[in-house]
Amino acid sequence: MNRLIVLCLFVAMIYATIALPKKEDISNDERSISVSKVPVKKSVAIAGAVIEGAKLTFGILEKILTVLGDINRKIAIGVDNESGREWTAQNAYFFSGTSDVVLPASVPNTKAFLYNAQKDRGPVATGVVGVLAYSLSNGNTLGILFSVPYDYNLYSNWWNIKLYKGIKRADRDMYNDLYYYAHPHKGDNGWHENSLGFGLKSKGFMTSSGQTILQIRVSRA
């Protein structure tokens, strides 16, 4: 009788071992669920965004160009504010081309703004040429020229940056000044530096192709 009881208990223990799942299987399932619930961080490399100035790279600007799609005249712009002052957007003026992006309303010190523009839509022979204007908290205005032509047999890429006294909006007069008279820089795949006056300086780089990136850093002199 005792042997029969022991045998029954032994069989019951074997059955329980087979029926219950192993601890390792449960923990594996839990790890899979927890990983799937981790949110994917979205990229901040979008035109119209304000990012940390230290994170402004050619790679970010290349991503912005890619988002614009298959357009043969386009530009991605990034300008890093290390001036010690906050910038406030005035407007964007286009001599040719267009943009769907609104200039960031303000750019604090140590931040950079991202922007893009493109040729006019449709089968039209135009480039993308314009000026961006930001006023500084000291009452002066930063004008930024970008020029990507349609016909490279006649024209080249050009860019410029100038600090104007007082609050100004970008317009045809500012474009003419920056393009023709204020010593613009050629987009030649090289860095160019110059003094902006008012205790500031700039350093910028522009590529020479029709799918262009323009990166500028404004800092204290």
UniProtKB/Swiss-Prot annotation:
<feature type="binding site">
    <location>
        <position position="149"/>
    </location>
    <ligand>
        <name>phosphocholine</name>
    </ligand>
</feature>
<feature type="region of interest" description="N-terminal region">
    <location>
        <begin position="53"/>
        <end position="72"/>
    </location>
</feature>
<feature type="binding site">
    <location>
        <position position="147"/>
    </location>
    <ligand>
        <name>phosphocholine</name>
    </ligand>
</feature>
<comment type="function">
    <text>Pore-forming protein that forms cations-selective hydrophilic pores of around 1 nm and causes cytolysis. Pore formation is a multi-step process that involves specific recognition of membrane sphingomyelin (but neither cholesterol nor phosphatidylcholine) using aromatic rich region and adjacent phosphocholine (POC) binding site, firm binding to the membrane (mainly driven by hydrophobic interactions) accompanied by the transfer of the N-terminal region to the lipid-water interface and finally pore formation after oligomerization of monomers.</text>
</comment>
<keyword id="KW-0813">Transport</keyword>
<keyword id="KW-0812">Transmembrane</keyword>
<dbReference type="GO" id="GO:0090729">
    <property type="term" value="F:toxin activity"/>
</dbReference>
<protein>
    <recommendedName>
        <fullName>DELTA-actitoxin-Ucs1a</fullName>
    </recommendedName>
</protein>
<keyword id="KW-0406">Ion transport</keyword>
<feature type="site" description="Interacts with the lipid membrane">
    <location>
        <position position="202"/>
    </location>
</feature>
<feature type="binding site">
    <location>
        <position position="175"/>
    </location>
    <ligand>
        <name>phosphocholine</name>
    </ligand>
</feature>
<dbReference type="GO" id="GO:0051715">
    <property type="term" value="P:cytolysis in another organism"/>
</dbReference>
<dbReference type="GO" id="GO:0046930">
    <property type="term" value="C:pore complex"/>
</dbReference>
<comment type="similarity">
    <text>Belongs to the actinoporin family. Sea anemone subfamily.</text>
</comment>
<dbReference type="GO" id="GO:0015267">
    <property type="term" value="F:channel activity"/>
</dbReference>
<dbReference type="InterPro" id="IPR015926">
    <property type="entry name" value="Cytolysin/lectin"/>
</dbReference>
<feature type="binding site">
    <location>
        <position position="180"/>
    </location>
    <ligand>
        <name>phosphocholine</name>
    </ligand>
</feature>
<keyword id="KW-0732">Signal</keyword>
<keyword id="KW-0166">Nematocyst</keyword>
<keyword id="KW-1053">Target membrane</keyword>
<dbReference type="InterPro" id="IPR009104">
    <property type="entry name" value="Anemon_actinoporin-like"/>
</dbReference>
<feature type="binding site">
    <location>
        <position position="96"/>
    </location>
    <ligand>
        <name>phosphocholine</name>
    </ligand>
</feature>
<keyword id="KW-0800">Toxin</keyword>
<dbReference type="GO" id="GO:0006812">
    <property type="term" value="P:monoatomic cation transport"/>
</dbReference>
<dbReference type="GO" id="GO:0044218">
    <property type="term" value="C:other organism cell membrane"/>
</dbReference>
<dbReference type="GO" id="GO:0005576">
    <property type="term" value="C:extracellular region"/>
</dbReference>
<keyword id="KW-0165">Cleavage on pair of basic residues</keyword>
<feature type="region of interest" description="Trp-rich region, which is important for the binding to lipid membrane">
    <location>
        <begin position="147"/>
        <end position="162"/>
    </location>
</feature>
<dbReference type="Pfam" id="PF06369">
    <property type="entry name" value="Anemone_cytotox"/>
</dbReference>
<keyword id="KW-0204">Cytolysis</keyword>
<dbReference type="GO" id="GO:0042151">
    <property type="term" value="C:nematocyst"/>
</dbReference>
<feature type="site" description="Important in the initial contact with the lipid membrane">
    <location>
        <position position="155"/>
    </location>
</feature>
<feature type="binding site">
    <location>
        <position position="129"/>
    </location>
    <ligand>
        <name>phosphocholine</name>
    </ligand>
</feature>
<feature type="binding site">
    <location>
        <position position="179"/>
    </location>
    <ligand>
        <name>phosphocholine</name>
    </ligand>
</feature>
<keyword id="KW-0472">Membrane</keyword>
<keyword id="KW-1052">Target cell membrane</keyword>
<comment type="subunit">
    <text>Octamer or nonamer in membranes. Monomer in the soluble state.</text>
</comment>
<keyword id="KW-0964">Secreted</keyword>
<feature type="short sequence motif" description="Cell attachment site, crucial for protein stability">
    <location>
        <begin position="186"/>
        <end position="188"/>
    </location>
</feature>
<feature type="propeptide">
    <location>
        <begin position="20"/>
        <end position="42"/>
    </location>
</feature>
<feature type="region of interest" description="Plays an important role in the hemolytic activity">
    <location>
        <begin position="45"/>
        <end position="54"/>
    </location>
</feature>
<feature type="signal peptide">
    <location>
        <begin position="1"/>
        <end position="19"/>
    </location>
</feature>
